């Protein structure tokens, strides 16, 4: 193994450990606070995955939107998809986030993490999940968003109750 490859591996591991440490501190603070906030204006905060139609072999861009936002700073969202039909390519941040990190968490599973400097108060797109529709895929395939009880919080570390809406990929 070359020295360059060793440096890349060590840097990648260090970056991953820093991300996990920040996530751990955030989650510990949420669990300690025991506070929960519901969406403002009497509505519900919703994280929804868009639906897309395309043919096999095509690359698709699937939006992940956030509506009913009472003001949120931290996001930890899991996604499940059919790995037999879709190949995960990458994630692009949406207009609501300054940055986000996504890790593959096994076959057909993704985890998105973002921590902003302060509460984001707008509604819009959190991120875009980029996939390729695999050859042989047919029919409909679901992309499921999963938000646990403490997956979204505000600057004051109060958990925000979030409903999720799954998206559908239709193969033409």
List each model region and its residues:
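Acidic, low-complexity intrinsically disordered segments
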Residues: 1-172
């Amino acid at each position: 193994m070359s020295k360059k490859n060793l440096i890349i591996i060590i840097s990648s591991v260090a970056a991953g450990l820093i991300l996990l440490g920040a996530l751990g501190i955030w989650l510990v603070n949420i669990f300690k606070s025991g506070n929960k906030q519901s969406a403002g204006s009497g509505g519900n905060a919703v994280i929804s995955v868009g639906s897309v139609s395309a043919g096999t072999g095509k690359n698709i861009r699937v939006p992940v939107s956030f509506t009913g936002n009472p003001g949120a700073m931290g996001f930890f969202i899991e996604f499940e998809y059919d790995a037999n039909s879709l190949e995960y390519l990458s994630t692009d941040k949406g207009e609501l986030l300054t940055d986000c990190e996504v890790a593959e968490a096994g076959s057909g599973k993704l985890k998105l993490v973002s921590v902003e400097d302060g509460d984001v108060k707008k509604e819009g797109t959190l991120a875009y999940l980029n996939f390729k529709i695999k050859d042989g895929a047919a029919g409909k395939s679901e992309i499921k968003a999963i938000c646990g009880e403490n997956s979204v919080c505000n600057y004051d570390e109060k958990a925000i109750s979030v409903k999720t809406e799954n998206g559908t990929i239709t193969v033409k």
